[in-house]
Amino acid sequence: MPSKKKKYNARFPPARIKKIMQTDEEIGKVAAAVPVIISRALELFLESLLKKACQVTQSRNAKTMTTSHLKQCIELEQQFDFLKDLVASVPDMQGDGEDNHMDGDKGARRGRKPGSGGRKNGGMGTKSKDKKLSGTDSEQEDESEDTDTDGEEETSQPPPQASHPSAHFQSPPTPFLPFASTLPLPPAPPGPSAPDEEDEEDYDS
């Protein structure tokens, strides 16, 4: 069975280059060496462009090269002036302060990942961290009010869910007999309590 790993080959196909060249009506026959030379020139050009763009990316302490990095590289290097029209629509590079702010956001996102597990358990873990980070007492009070309301919403939601199944237990007692047998002694008294509930309904009406 042949191996699936292929050697990386960044060479541009001379046959494709020859076809592109021959689309121009002014070009007739093309010598065999010409597409090979153009292919190699294209490799060298891309290598120099990417090295310069990589330097720009590293100078910004970024891990991912973006179109903004390429644009800045093209604007800084005179040899790439002919590419300025291609990158005219690309947004400009952000300033150093904004970049540092973005890096801080990335760090904050990384910091929240462990807290995301806390959200599954009720969401209180990340909010308590936010309290520690906020500087003023008024902000902490606002956040504590938010957490209190969130807590009330969270606690108010589970009881209705719990009450719905209990309503099902009381209304059809026969299908739930096996489930009732697992409960301790209290299932026996519900028989007499059912008339009490009906009596209470009579009093209410």
From Swiss-Prot:
One of its GO terms (cellular component) is nucleus. Residues 14-77 form the Histone-fold domain. Its main location: nucleus. Residues 91-205 are annotated as: Disordered. Residues 138-155, 195-205 have a biased composition (Acidic residues). It is found in: Nucleus. Keywords: DNA-binding, Nucleus, Phosphoprotein, Repressor, Transcription, Transcription regulation. Gene3D superfamilies: Histone, subunit A. Ubiquitous. Highly expressed in adult testis, heart, skeletal muscle, pancreas and brain, and in fetal brain, liver and kidney. Residues 184-193 have a biased composition (Pro residues). SUPFAM superfamilies: Histone-fold. Residues 114-125 have a biased composition (Gly residues). GO terms for biological process: negative regulation of transcription by RNA polymerase II; transcription by RNA polymerase II. Phosphorylation reduces DNA binding, but has no effect on heterodimerization and TBP binding. One of its GO terms (molecular function) is identical protein binding. The keyword Oxidoreductase does not apply. Residues 98-108 have a biased composition (Basic and acidic residues). Heterodimer with DR1. Binds BTAF1. Belongs to the NC2 alpha/DRAP1 family. The association of the DR1/DRAP1 heterodimer with TBP results in a functional repression of both activated and basal transcription of class II genes. This interaction precludes the formation of a transcription-competent complex by inhibiting the association of TFIIA and/or TFIIB with TBP. Can bind to DNA on its own. This is Dr1-associated corepressor.
